Regions:
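Short, well-structured N-terminal submotif of metal-dependent ribonuclease cores
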Residues: 1-35, 50-55
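A general structural signal for well-ordered alpha-helical segments in protein cores
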Residues: 35, 39, 61, 79-82
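Active-site neighborhoods of divalent-metal-dependent phosphate/nucleic-acid chemistry enzymes
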Residues: 70-119
Length: 146
């Protein structure tokens, strides 16, 4: 099965499995923007929320960057479709990019972003109409436990 990992899922997989994450995600797909989203999330957790130290954040980001060498890093092929989905579902263009890539690759979208999951589920009719198909959603726990 093919997987597109969004930043929330990739970050949670790395946090849970560390370098052992490679076994679960090798050959999966992610977007060019993913490392930046993860870096921003780690910055926020270290700087604003004080959940982790800068050292912990740096270690996690370094692990992510090493794992990215074993993933297919891609971009959506159809930017107009991406914008249309962002508009219809009222989500960010970033989030819509993950949906479009999953659709284009006939892959499952792995996300732990509750808000995104809810929007996709609530907007399934709109997605069906715009894409002509549906996108299967999974969580990082489903990947970790597989």
């Amino acid at each position: 099965m093919r997987y597109v990992l969004d930043s929330s899922a990739l970050l949670n997989i790395v946090r849970t499995l560390g370098s052992r994450a490679l076994q679960r995600i090798k050959g999966s797909y992610t977007l060019t923007l993913t490392p930046y989203e993860i870096g921003n999330a780690l910055w926020k957790e270290a700087t604003l929320l004080k959940r982790v130290t800068l050292g912990e954040s740096t270690y996690i980001l370094s692990t992510v960057m090493q794992l990215l060498k074993f993933l297919h890093v891609v971009e959506p092929g159809n930017v107009e479709l991406t914008l249309n989905i962002a508009y219809k579902l009222r989500i960010t263009y970033y989030d819509a990019s993950y949906i479009v890539v999953a659709y284009e690759l006939n892959a499952s979208l792995v996300t732990d972003d509750y808000k995104l999951r809810r929007r996709v589920e609530e907007g399934s009719r709109d997605l069906q109409e715009v894409l002509g198909g549906k996108v299967t959603l999974l969580t990082s726990n489903e990947i970790i436990q597989s």
